[in-house]
């Protein structure tokens, strides 16, 4: 590697809107302000809502589930 062409790798702090502070390293060189981090994101906290969009079978049963075939 050539000397003097690579950016400096410095310590920065990433501050979340929930108050969590994460110390990390970056070549950007300035502190970050985050909207969401692993301490407040619903996926990581377990407060995630699972949405079932349903498939073709569910759609069919919703439309024709109560009907019976005549012989």
UniProtKB/Swiss-Prot annotation:
Query: RNA-binding among the record's keywords?
Result: yes
Its cellular-component GO annotations read: ribonucleoprotein complex; ribosome
The cross-references to InterPro entries, in alphabetical order and at most eight, read: Ribosomal_bL28/bL31-like_sf, Ribosomal_bL31, Ribosomal_bL31_A, Ribosomal_bL31_sf
Question: Quick one: a GO biological-process term for this protein?
Answer: translation
**Taxonomy, superkingdom:** Bacteria
Report residues binding Zn(2+): 16, 18, 37, 40
Q: Which Pfam families match?
A: Ribosomal_L31
Q: Which SUPFAM superfamilies match?
A: L28p-like
Q: Which GO terms describe its molecular function?
A: metal ion binding; rRNA binding; structural constituent of ribosome
Output the PROSITE patterns linked to this UniProt entry: RIBOSOMAL_L31 (PS01143)
Question: What Gene3D superfamilies does the record point to?
Answer: Ribosomal protein L31 (4.10.830.30)
The record's cofactor note says: Binds 1 zinc ion per subunit.
Query: Which keywords label this protein?
Result: Metal-binding, Ribonucleoprotein, Ribosomal protein, RNA-binding, rRNA-binding, Zinc
Which cofactors does this gene product need? Zn(2+)
Function field:
Binds the 23S rRNA.
- Family affiliation: Belongs to the bacterial ribosomal protein bL31 family. Type A subfamily.
Q: NCBIfam families in the record, alphabetically?
A: L31, PRK00019.1, PRK00528.1
Q: How does it assemble?
A: Part of the 50S ribosomal subunit.
Entry protein name? Large ribosomal subunit protein bL31
What species was this sequence derived from?
A: Aeromonas salmonicida (strain A449)
């Amino acid at each position: 590697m050539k000397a003097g062409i690579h950016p400096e790798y410095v310590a920065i702090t990433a501050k979340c809107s929930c108050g969590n502070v994460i110390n990390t390293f970056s070549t950007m060189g300035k502190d970050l302000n985050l909207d969401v981090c692993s301490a407040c994101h619903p996926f990581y906290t377990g407060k995630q809502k699972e949405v079932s969009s349903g498939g073709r079978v569910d759609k069919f049963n919703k439309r024709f589930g109560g009907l019976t075939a005549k012989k």
